[in-house]
């Protein structure tokens, strides 16, 4: 079974950032080879439209057959608002709440990000999962790309 990995904008952008490039590039290469399924959202696609050309080329290198796109639908919006209402994230970070909610509602295997303040943050992960369980959703795994690479 191939892992379905929701990938936020920071990971694709990380391919062009010296600090994050090694693990971001390796993960994207796994998507290109079809070893993992790249799960994006319509929100991620919108955010990437404003990214540098080099970042957009990284995404374009992944065959469409290896990509799944999830929608920011009413279910995800409602779940994101529940994270905000519970104080897990402030309202000004609604886009981050949307990423978590889309991945949760889409029941991905893991969400990867380099956003340590609002996403890959133990206290917030506990908050997201507390809301998820109260709302009848499964807990969400949130990791960095380094933690999900095949040979790490």
Question: Which ranges hold each PLM region?
Answer:
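General small-molecule cofactor/ligand-binding pocket signal
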Residues: 39, 70, 141-143
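Short, well-structured N-terminal submotif of metal-dependent ribonuclease cores
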Residues: 1-40, 46-61, 67, 85-91, ...
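C-terminal end-helix/capping segment
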Residues: 122-141, 145
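Generic beta-sheet signal
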Residues: 41, 113-114, 145
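Residue-level signal for beta-strand positions within conserved beta-sheet cores that form or flank
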Residues: 34, 112, 138
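Extended, non-globular alpha-helical segments
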Residues: 58-61, 71-72, 144
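Active-site neighborhoods of divalent-metal-dependent phosphate/nucleic-acid chemistry enzymes
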Residues: 68-127, 149
């Amino acid at each position: 079974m191939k892992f379905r990995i929701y990938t936020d904008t920071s990971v694709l952008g990380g391919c062009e950032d010296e600090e994050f490039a090694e693990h971001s590039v390796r993960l994207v290469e796994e998507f290109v080879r079809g070893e993992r399924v790249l799960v994006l959202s319509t929100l991620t696609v919108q955010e990437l439209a404003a990214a540098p050309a080099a970042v957009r080329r990284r995404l374009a290198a992944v065959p469409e057959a290896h990509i799944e796109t999830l929608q920011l639908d009413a279910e995800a919006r409602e779940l994101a608002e529940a994270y905000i209402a519970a104080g897990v994230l402030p309202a000004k970070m609604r886009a981050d709440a949307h990423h978590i909610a889309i991945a949760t509602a889409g029941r991905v295997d893991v969400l990867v990000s380099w956003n340590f303040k609002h996403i890959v943050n133990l206290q917030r992960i506990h908050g997201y999962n507390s809301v998820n369980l109260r709302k009848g959703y499964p807990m969400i795994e949130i990791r960095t790309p380094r933690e999900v690479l095949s040979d790490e």
